[in-house]
């Protein structure tokens, strides 16, 4: 088969068509040869294809055509170079040849022995999804840890440090005989009965026995005199609305036989705990807690009622409440008057063993650290829950109001000696506590309106420690 060298045309459209056909024919045969070489050769070859024509015919192209020629041919395609004709006398290429660029292709063919020669294979890497910056790390077996046991955590706590009463856990597991033998505080006899018709609970305090003898003031030896016991009754968690029996003089086996009624719905009563506290009123007018008895009312039949003998256990409350006082304050800016109403008191400490208390209230106005005025209520005989409903008025200009303090002191009237101190509070510039401060601020914010509030009485020492106004009065 003869290879015909065509002379490129230099004129117009025909010249472009000829060059395009020659390039297309050459590229088709080049691609076919490259494919055959990739399937048959095991070594790496470099094939260079030059174009466009006129150019020297590659050797492998001439070898593929030699199989169609006769064996008598003298020259091979590789020995007969094809040279293009030129019209210029100096043998240079025409302007159409120089305007065409020369293409060069270099292909490195790798060994494909393992592939089938009949069809080409495309080597595609598997697609991996994930964060590009993440690094693969081999999974290591985790270190076995000790099995967690919740009990190990709670063993670190000491429950008795968080208990309100350190003896409560021990007492629950003991009988009344064991409690009496362990603490030796005596026993208390009482009963309960709920009235569904009137919705009230009746608590009857009957008697006590085997109460311990009182301790002397310094605590070093026992006082040979007998105790002066009484009982306080309340329904926890409400300790404000408590009841109190009379004081029984010089006895370790007091008989009370007193009844007290609590107005409370039946369902609410079942959620309460009955607390009875036995207190000793000694000859130094001190109130010392002997012991207590607590009964959850959900564990008893309130409607049917019942009687109990219960052993007394130690109480964490060594000091009893001093009582409460209900006051009303009102300031009139136009008149410059500070009005005070002493309404009532409840559950005051007894100051006389035989007659109870004859309480009265002293009101003292202090401006800065100077006592200005003193007034007092009348005293009521033989009661610890007095009703006064008495009003007092003090002249306080508005510019001096912020420096004013009111000192309220409850005394037990004593005709034979000085009056017995029961409790005190301070309201105003030098208030004795948060409750008193709140009452004073409410009055300042609501002029011409009476503001009522209950206050728990404090000891003289506590008031003197926190309020300078308390130090200025007697």
Swiss-Prot record:
Residues 96-112 have a biased composition (Low complexity). The keyword Lipoprotein does not apply. Residues 60-112 are annotated as: Disordered. InterPro entries: C2_dom, C2_domain_sf, Synaptotagmin, Synaptotagmin-15/17_C2A, Syt17_C2B. It comes from Homo sapiens. Expressed abundantly in brain (frontal and temporal lobes, hippocampus, hypothalamus, amygdala, substantia nigra, and pituitary), kidney, and prostate. Expressed in fetal brain, kidney and lung. Expressed in melanocytes. GO terms for biological process: cell differentiation; positive regulation of dendrite extension; regulation of calcium ion-dependent exocytosis; regulation of postsynaptic neurotransmitter receptor internalization; vesicle-mediated transport. GO terms for cellular component: exocytic vesicle; glutamatergic synapse; plasma membrane; postsynapse; trans-Golgi network. This is Synaptotagmin-17. Its main location: membrane. GO terms for molecular function: calcium ion sensor activity; calcium-dependent phospholipid binding; SNARE binding. The lineage of its organism: Eukaryota, Metazoa, Chordata, Craniata, Vertebrata. Residues 184-310, 321-455 form the C2 domain. Coiled coil: none annotated. Pfam families: C2. Belongs to the synaptotagmin family. Plays a role in dendrite formation by melanocytes. The modification Phosphoserine is found at residues 118-119. It comes from the Eukaryota. It is found in: Membrane.
């Amino acid at each position: 088969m003869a290879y015909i060298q065509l002379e490129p045309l230099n004129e117009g459209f025909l010249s472009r068509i000829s060059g395009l056909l020659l390039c297309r024919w050459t590229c088709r045969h080049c691609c076919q040869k490259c494919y055959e070489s990739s399937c048959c050769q095991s070594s790496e070859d470099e094939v260079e294809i030059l174009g466009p024509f006129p150019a020297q015919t590659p050797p492998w192209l001439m070898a593929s055509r030699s199989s169609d020629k006769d064996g008598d041919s003298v020259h091979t395609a590789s020995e007969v170079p094809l040279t293009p004709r030129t019209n210029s006398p100096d043998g240079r290429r025409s302007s159409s040849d120089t305007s065409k660029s020369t293409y060069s292709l270099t292909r490195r063919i790798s060994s494909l022995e393992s592939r089938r020669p009949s069809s080409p294979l495309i080597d595609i890497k598997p697609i991996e999804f994930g964060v590009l910056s993440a690094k693969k790390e081999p999974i290591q077996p985790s270190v076995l840890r000790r099995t967690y046991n919740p009990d190990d955590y709670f063993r670190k706590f000491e429950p008795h440090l968080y208990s309100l009463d350190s003896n409560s856990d021990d007492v629950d597991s003991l009988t009344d005989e064991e409690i009496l033998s362990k603490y030796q505080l005596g026993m208390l006899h009482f009963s309960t009965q709920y009235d569904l018709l009137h919705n009230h609970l009746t608590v009857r305090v009957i008697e006590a026995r085997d109460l311990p003898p009182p301790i002397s003031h310094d605590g070093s030896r026992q006082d040979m005199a007998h105790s002066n016991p009484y009982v306080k009754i309340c329904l926890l968690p409400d300790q404000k609305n408590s009841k109190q029996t009379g004081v029984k003089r010089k006895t370790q086996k007091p008989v009370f036989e007193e009844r007290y009624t609590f107005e409370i719905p039946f369902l609410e009563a079942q959620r309460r705990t009955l607390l009875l506290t036995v207190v000793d009123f000694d000859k130094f007018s001190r109130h010392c807690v002997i012991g207590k008895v607590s009964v959850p009312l959900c564990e008893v039949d309130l409607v049917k009622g019942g009687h109990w003998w219960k052993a007394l256990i130690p109480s964490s409350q060594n000091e009893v409440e001093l009582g409460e006082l209900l006051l009303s304050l009102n300031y009139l800016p136009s008149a410059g008057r500070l009005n005070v109403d002493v309404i009532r008191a409840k559950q005051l400490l007894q100051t006389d063993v035989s007659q109870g208390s004859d309480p009265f209230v002293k009101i003292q106005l202090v401006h800065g650290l100077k006592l200005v005025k003193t007034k007092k209520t009348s005293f009521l005989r033989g009661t610890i829950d007095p009703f006064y409903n008495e009003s007092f008025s003090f002249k306080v200009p508005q510019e001096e109001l912020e420096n004013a303090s009111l000192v309220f002191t409850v005394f037990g009237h004593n005709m034979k000696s000085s009056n017995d101190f029961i409790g005190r509070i301070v309201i105003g510039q030098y208030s004795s506590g948060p409750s008193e401060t709140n009452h004073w601020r409410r009055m300042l914010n609501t002029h011409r309106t009476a503001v009522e509030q209950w206050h728990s009485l404090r000891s003289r020492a506590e008031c003197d420690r926190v309020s300078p106004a308390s130090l200025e009065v007697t």
